[in-house]
């Protein structure tokens, strides 16, 4: 299977390495020229949760035209780069190509669908899955708990189960999920509660929850996000957002 990883940062390096080692034809693209040049000259080194090794056979480039059409595109950019990645993919992919993006925030599916058919798109959410870049050509795999994947329109399909299978075979812990939108929103509500307030107030999660005033502000965001989800008719697994977080 020809797989293209779009965005060869920390997470992209994990995806590219494991799929390459599973026997797939893997290409990876990134705009960070120093990183790409380092991989071309001395390979991609990945260490950590999935083991330590250096791979010299990864096809890397800064030009999407070098990759061309692929069976599967994995968008591994940060959220701000999703639309650009989708535009790149749209310029070379076919109607039979599948695109998967693993983003924990909202809106990735909508941004990608502007550049290709939403029927080609699979969404993913990572839980306890982390990685970091040590330097050009060198990444660290911090942890790998679970990736949930699902159809944009919901349901369990044959292609979703096929993707679950090839990700499993590459060493990932992956589960096909019937309602990925529910999962994305539930994670979003948690992020609204903790991520922004902790950043703004420069507090850890524990410190935030121990401060009555700041915690009340954080829960205001929780409740607002919950109300928006209800208006959008998202099928959440809870009715009390405060108890949930």
Locations of regions flagged by a protein language model:
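Short catalytic/ligand-gating loop segments at beta-alpha or beta-beta junctions
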Residues: 238-244
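Rossmann-like NAD(P)(H) cofactor-binding subdomain of soluble oxidoreductases
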Residues: 29, 53-138
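Short, solvent-exposed loop/turn elements at beta->coil junctions and helix N-caps
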Residues: 128, 179-182, 245
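A structural signal for isolated positions on well-ordered beta-strands in alpha/beta enzyme cores
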Residues: 4, 27, 98-100, 122, ...
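Internal alpha-helical scaffold of NAD(P)-dependent oxidoreductase catalytic cores
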Residues: 92, 115-120, 135-238
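Short, charged/polar "capping" segments at the starts of alpha-helices
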Residues: 35-38, 109-110, 157
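NAD(P)+-binding Rossmann beta1-loop-alpha1 motif at the extreme N-terminus of oxidoreductases
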Residues: 1-52
């Amino acid at each position: 299977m020809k797989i293209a990883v779009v965005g060869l940062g920390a997470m992209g390096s994990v995806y590219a390495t494991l799929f390459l080692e599973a026997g797939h034809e893997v290409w990876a693209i990134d705009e960070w020229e120093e990183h790409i040049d380092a991989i071309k000259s001395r390979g991609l080194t990945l260490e950590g949760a999935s083991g330590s090794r250096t791979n010299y056979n990864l096809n890397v480039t800064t030009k999407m035209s070098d990759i061309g059409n692929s069976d599967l595109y994995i968008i591994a950019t940060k959220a701000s780069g999703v639309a650009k990645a989708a535009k790149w993919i749209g310029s070379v992919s076919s109607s039979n190509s599948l695109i998967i993006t693993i983003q924990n925030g909202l809106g990735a599916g909508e941004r990608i669908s502007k550049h290709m058919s939403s029927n080609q798109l699979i969404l993913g959410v990572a839980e306890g899955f982390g990685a970091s870049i040590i330097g050009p050509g060198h990444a660290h795999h911090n942890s790998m708990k679970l990736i949930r994947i699902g159809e944009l329109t919901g349901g369990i399909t044959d292609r979703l189960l096929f993707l679950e299978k090839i990700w499993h075979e590459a060493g990932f812990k992956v589960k096909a999920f019937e309602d990925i939108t529910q999962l994305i929103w539930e994670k979003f509500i948690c992020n609204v509660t903790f991520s922004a307030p902790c950043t703004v107030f420069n507090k850890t999660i524990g410190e935030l929850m121990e401060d009555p005033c700041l915690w009340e502000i954080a829960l205001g965001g929780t409740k607002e996000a919950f109300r928006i989800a209800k208006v959008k008719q998202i099928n959440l697994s809870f009715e009390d957002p405060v108890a949930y977080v």
